[in-house]
């Protein structure tokens, strides 16, 4: 892996180990490269992968367009987060399990006052979820379910009977993105990460609550009708983000884009 941006001593042609040589980065180096803002303000970032022709999935899953370096970054972003938000459809399709504690991040998380692993927060309007799965019954830290006040009462009851904390973050059937963020922050989860899917990310984009996008560009073409990284109603005025970091490995590009004025 090599750093392309920002241009620093590490990206010059200076000979030696600090040059932009193609090598595997340590988890500590990745953690520094993807650190949250140090001032403690709430921060919502998304982590997504896309092909050259804009597909966010292949055969319904993201794994087919990912790579080992992308998965290292995926693990790093989880290792830094207080909470991971995921849409119910993505949780089902990708077979989400409880986040695990990783020794490589233990000291860093303890120093930041974080638990041993990030909380998984599943976003669902209908709560069509199997609450007997390990994600809900055997997590290291309790899983949350975010929904609206109009969610089916029997499914809310089923979740609570399984010991799941149901967080109401909207007056209708689904969540209101800004309210969901506020509910998480109120629980001390200021370092927020969403892994999609496209529908959930589209909601955050449309509501203007996304602070950062970590986007992997996979050097493949898939054609077909796969979703983009964000779907749903469009925004009236496109919101501008600025490129803050760019890494490369084996043709994959790993970018960070921050909302203008919040970098």
Predicted regions and their residues:
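Enzymes that bind and transform nitrogen-containing heteroaromatic metabolites
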Residues: 1-263
